[in-house]
Swiss-Prot record:
It comes from the Bacteria. Keywords: Chaperone. Coiled coil: none annotated. Gene3D superfamilies: DnaJ domain (1.10.287.110), HscB, C-terminal domain (1.20.1280.20). Co-chaperone involved in the maturation of iron-sulfur cluster-containing proteins. Seems to help targeting proteins to be folded toward HscA. Interacts with HscA and stimulates its ATPase activity. Residues 2-69 form the J domain. This is Co-chaperone protein HscB homolog. GO terms for molecular function: ATPase activator activity; protein-folding chaperone binding. GO terms for biological process: [2Fe-2S] cluster assembly; protein complex oligomerization; protein folding. The keyword Chaperone applies. The gene is hscB. SMART domains: DnaJ (SM00271). It comes from Acinetobacter baumannii (strain SDF). Belongs to the HscB family.
């Protein structure tokens, strides 16, 4: 049984994330080790459910998993050789490093999301045409942007922490 089947979802890049979450919570309850007669087996199943959920939750890992189902996921860890992309990626990283406000981070997030949306469209075309080399390249780019989104989240958290500690200092 693949991850999509586990959560009763179509084998596709576009999935209903609310259904994924709902089915995940239901399966978590069903296979919770504390409620099972065979705790070891329930622990294994629970771990599989958690891993499948993590994989399907993010578009980059979901795309990579789709390639894995077609046995086309080899060399996904190779570096990206698209010079224009690398140049844009470097500029984006510099903008993130220089971001000092929530507004700047929001703008950056929107830009990254636009990149991701474009790459998702590219992946769907590559996947449907079975252009595996291009699909793998697109997954590599999606992974890069997912990491940037994660770093934006961290930067936002850091800004909030800094603002909170600054507000505390104002009270003294």
């Amino acid at each position: 049984m693949n991850h999509f089947e586990l959560f009763n979802l179509p084998v596709a890049l576009d999935i209903d994330l609310a259904s994924l979450k709902s089915n995940f919570l239901s399966l978590q309850q069903q296979y919770h080790p504390d409620k099972a007669a065979d705790k070891d087996q329930a622990l294994i199943k629970s771990s599989e459910i958690n891993q499948a959920f993590k994989t399907l939750s993010q578009v980059d890992s979901r795309a990579a998993y789709l390639l894995a189902l077609k046995k086309q996921d080899h060399h996904l860890d190779q570096s990206i050789s698209d010079f224009e992309f690398l140049q844009s990626a470097l500029e984006l990283r510099e903008q993130l490093d220089e971001a000092t406000s929530s507004e700047h981070l929001r703008t950056l997030r929107l830009e990254v999301q636009q990149w991701i949306d474009g790459l998702v469209r590219e992946f769907k075309i590559d996947y449907s045409e079975e252009d595996w080399s291009e699909a793998r390249d697109t997954v590599r780019k999606l992974r890069f942007f997912q990491r940037v989104l994660n770093d934006i989240d961290k930067a936002e958290d850091q800004l909030l922490d800094d603002e909170d500690s600054f507000d505390l200092d104002d009270d003294f």
